[in-house]
Structure formats: C-alpha cells, structure tokens
C-alpha cells in the first residue's frame, strides 16, 4: 500500500503497471486492475525522481542515480558509465522545481539501449557500454536556454524527437530531426566571454544560435563559483589568451 496520501510523480510502465513515488518510502509499483502492490523499490528512502526507458526504471535519491529491471525488480549492474555521466552534472541530480524535469529518459532504438535528455542535449547509451554518446548538442538549440524546462518527450518511427517544454510563459513543442549530412558542430565558432555565470547571456546565445545555425556560440565563464579563482585571476587568464591569439 501507499504510505503517503499524496505523490509528486507517477508514470505507467510498458508492463501496464503504475509507478508511484511514495514520499519518504521509495517507489511503489501498482497493478491498476486491482490496486495490488507488485513490488517496492528503495523502501524507506526519499526518492526525488523516477523515469522509465522501456523495461528499465531509473531513480534519483541523494544526488545518485539508480537503475532497475522492471521485469525482475533487480538493480541494473552494468550502467556505471551512465551513472558517472549523469551524476557529474549537478543540474541533473538536484531537483529544484516540479514544473519541469531537468532529466528524462526514453526507450532506445535497441532492447538494451536508452535515450536521455537534459539541458546539455540528447544522449544515447547501450547497457554495459563504456561511453555515453551525445546525439543532439543542447548548446546549438533551445535545450540550453535557462528559461526552457522539459516536461515530456517522445520519438517517432523515423527517429525524430519531439520535446515538450515550458518556455517562459509559453508551452512549446520542439522537433529535432537527425541528418547525417549536417555537421555535429558548425565550422564557424563565436566565443563569448563572461566573467561570471549569466542567464541573460545564455538566453541571448540561444537566440543568436537559432537565427544563425551555421555559427557555433561558445560561452566561456571566467569564474565558476566552485573554486577559489578571483576576478583578477580570471582577467589575467583572459588577457593571456587574447595576447596569445
């Protein structure tokens, strides 16, 4: 049974069951035909997020990613490259809103593969693989815009992706079409320097990128805020790079 009287996230599985986040008590998998409990994941633990990709369940709790086989309920033991990649991005594992999802999963093009999307783009991963492949660069489109939040996404039979987003005060659906003839990164690069992280500059870069898709906008930030670099240090590095051409 569900311990709490409310939930902040639930989703259907390919098996026809329903996954419900039970606040403070993990995830409950329910048979909707009779309301019975199929199994429980991470019992007694606060889970911040759930997502499915085919027969796989993914959860985030305490900034760590966990994967499970929905057929057996057992943990996935061959996703180390995936967990390392996702956990390295604080925006993917720190949830600060319920109006959108910083991270979402999707069934892959093979039984043992999956796609996931975040603010940096769309990625493909094959279970057991040592690398995570980026197939859409978020810096070249609206995915990287600070005012864009993903709420849903899917893929059609031709392999095209459709992403529903909260974009400021609007709801938009973006489509991304893969073309083998389109370079992954434009040949022309424009570097924009910002002493500190700035959302206005990021939004401006996204708008420029959309208007001029043949130019890659590279934003460099002098001070990340995560280290002891001062503004003087950052400007010295910038001047050195400018003098070096």
Features from the language model and the residues they span:
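Extracytoplasmic/lumenal domain signature
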Residues: 30-36, 70-73
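Repeated polar recognition positions within modular binding domains
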Residues: 6, 23-25, 63
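Conserved N-terminal structural module of periplasmic/extracytoplasmic solute-binding proteins
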Residues: 10, 48-52, 58-63, 72, ...
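N-terminus-biased targeting/localization segments
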Residues: 1, 7-10, 20-22, 30-32
């Amino acid at each position: 049974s569900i311990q709490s009287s409310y939930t902040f996230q639930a989703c259907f599985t390919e098996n026809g069951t329903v996954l419900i986040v039970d606040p403070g008590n993990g995830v409950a998998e329910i048979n909707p035909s009779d309301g019975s409990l199929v199994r429980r994941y991470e019992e007694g633990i606060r889970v911040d997020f759930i997502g499915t990709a085919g027969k796989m369940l993914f959860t985030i709790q305490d900034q760590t990613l966990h994967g499970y086989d929905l057929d057996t309920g057992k943990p996935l033991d061959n996703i180390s490259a995936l967990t390392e990649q996702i956990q390295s991005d604080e925006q993917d594992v720190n949830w600060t809103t319920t109006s959108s999802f910083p991270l979402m999963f999707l069934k892959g093009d093979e039984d043992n593969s999956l796609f996931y999307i975040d603010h940096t783009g769309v990625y493909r991963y094959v279970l057991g693989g040592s690398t995570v492949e980026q197939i859409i660069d978020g810096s070249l489109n609206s995915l990287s815009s600070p005012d864009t939040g993903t709420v849903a996404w899917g893929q059609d039979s031709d392999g095209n992706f459709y992403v529903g987003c909260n974009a400021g005060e609007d709801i938009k659906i973006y489509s991304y079409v893969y073309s083998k003839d389109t370079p992954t990164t434009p040949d022309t690069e424009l570097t924009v320097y910002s002493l500190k992280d700035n959302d206005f500059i990021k939004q401006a870069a996204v708008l420029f990128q959309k208007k001029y898709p043949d130019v890659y906008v590279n934003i460099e930030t002098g001070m990340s805020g995560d280290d002891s670099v001062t503004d003087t240090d950052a400007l010295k590095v910038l001047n050195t790079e400018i003098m070096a051409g």
